[in-house]
């Protein structure tokens, strides 16, 4: 059975073009979502994935209508293949029921994996470069060491943590973490 899936990014957009193409391709059922492809929550896609069974073919008008990213798309099509379900994209001329279509998807999978590895590599290189320049990542500390020492001196003088917290606009729990209760009598 050919089962279609259409998606538009907003409620203002029309699914008619996609629906017509899927109907012309012979889709018996068509599911739809009106949401950004970046959103993981797509009820129409969830329904179609539950509905598909061995021997069915999921048909989309264009690849970007199905996947949020190339990696997501490859993973999704692999899951379909594992369940005995084919995938077809009309405008991209992809059909995983054919040897050429399966080959194309293997190539896409390899490219997606390479892309992921390159991102990891660039991220590591960027972090290493930042460390070499003395940056350690994360946000800047709210207080310099001198300010912490001032708080410590007040606590040592017996000023209650709550009062120090108000003076320095810091949570009492932060003071307990930085200066454990066993350190002071307050």
From Swiss-Prot:
Q: Which CDD domains match?
A: SR_ResInv
Top-rank taxon of the source lineage equals: Viruses
User: Which controlled-vocabulary keywords does the entry list?
Assistant: DNA integration, DNA invertase, DNA recombination, DNA-binding, Viral receptor tropism switching, Virus entry into host cell
Q: Which PROSITE patterns match?
A: RECOMBINASES_1, RECOMBINASES_2, RECOMBINASES_3
Q: Which GO terms describe its biological process?
A: DNA integration; symbiont entry into host cell; viral tropism switching
Positions of the catalytic residues? 9 (o-(5'-phospho-dna)-serine intermediate)
Q: Which family does it belong to?
A: Belongs to the site-specific recombinase resolvase family.
Explain the purpose of this protein: Performs inversion of a viral 3 kp segment (C-segment) that encodes two alternate pairs of tail fiber proteins thereby modifying the host specificity of the virus.
Q: Which PANTHER family match?
A: DNA-INVERTASE FROM LAMBDOID PROPHAGE, SERINE RECOMBINASE PINE-RELATED
This protein's name: DNA-invertase
């Amino acid at each position: 059975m050919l089962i279609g899936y259409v998606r538009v990014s907003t409620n203002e957009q029309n699914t008619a073009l996609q629906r017509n193409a899927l109907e012309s391709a012979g889709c018996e059922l068509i599911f739809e979502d009106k949401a950004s492809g970046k959103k993981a929550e797509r009820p129409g896609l969830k329904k179609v994935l539950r509905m598909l069974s061995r021997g069915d073919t999921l048909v989309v008008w264009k690849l970007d209508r199905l996947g949020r990213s190339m990696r997501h798309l490859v993973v999704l099509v692999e899951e379909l293949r594992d369940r005995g379900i084919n995938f077809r994209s009309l405008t991209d001329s992809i059909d995983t029921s054919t040897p050429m279509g399966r080959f194309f998807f293997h190539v896409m999978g390899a490219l997606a994996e390479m892309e992921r590895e390159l991102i990891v590599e660039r991220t590591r290189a960027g972090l290493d470069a930042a460390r070499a320049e003395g940056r350690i990542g994360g946000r800047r500390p709210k207080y310099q060491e001198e300010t912490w020492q001032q708080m410590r001196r007040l606590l040592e003088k017996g000023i209650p943590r709550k009062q120090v917290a108000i003076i320095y606009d810091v949570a009492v729990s932060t003071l307990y973490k930085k200066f454990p209760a066993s350190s002071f009598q307050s």
